[in-house]
């Protein structure tokens, strides 16, 4: 456990009233085989009231975002009892309401340390079930993800015009992994993938990681209650305002914490995802895929996925064993998108990798 901090200055930051250290709390559970691979679960340790510049008024932030922080601590309590191949980080990020400063600082730190981040699960508001729209729902939740990394090359961007992949970036694959894990292990829940970086025009602490090319998503409640969000505690015209603990549903928070736990455990136990995944098959009645293989003691085999180009989820799959290439006979490349994952002997599976290279 350690503190990671950066000095944020008032100059140039309209939401910062004075120079201050933005301090994150970071706890690392080291992996046994791949300690430099990290899956991160984050909550936020800051809050705000109606006026973001008012740092003296009470701003309990029970749902936004004590719930995310409580989830990270509870996940650490549960998962720390197990050993994983990859490392897990549980982190409390600061300065989110003032400009995503904590996430930006940790993302820079990760870059400087050469961390290989497998994914960031940003939990920001995971405890409210009663929306301002009148809906009460304790089973659904949202998974926000950007389509492709902003750091991708111009060559990759041009290539996508001809070969596809507009909705298949690394963060979108991470979102699909969360969706699939939930459907498999928590079928009572209804995960909603939202094809958007975050809520309309808004931001969260996964974005600074996305900005530098790391996969990251936001996990949160489906129905927000704006009367309880960024509000001074008060009563107006019979309406209660303020983010207090009475607005938190602990059973729901527990469910979304479990979603994080099964996602992190799945990734942290699984083999590393395939690398150099390539595809070919133009004007042929079959699709060819290839990838770099891991040593036999690190992986049991590989699984090829495909889906209709309009489908949000991977709907078809075939386990092909411990091979480095495979041809799907009778599957025309034009009609589907494809991906490859790595699987261990216990069935733990990596995030699916979309091909970014061509077989000539």
Annotate each language-model stretch with its function.
Residues 285-298:
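Conserved aromatic anchor
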Residues 328-350:
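Beta-strand-rich modules
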Residues 1-30:
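A non-catalytic alpha/beta surface segment that caps or lines the substrate-entry region
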Residues 316-323:
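Short beta-strand segments within Ig-like beta-sandwich modules, predominantly Fibronectin type-III
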Residues 93-204:
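Metal-dependent peptidase/peptidase-like ectodomains
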Residues 126-146, 193-269:
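Active-site-adjacent mobile loop/cap segments within catalytic or ligand-binding domains
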Residues 27, 41, 46-47, 52-100, ...:
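Alpha-helical metal-binding/catalytic segments enriched in His/Glu/Asp
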Residues 301-304:
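Short beta-strand elements bearing conserved aromatic residues within extracellular beta-rich modules
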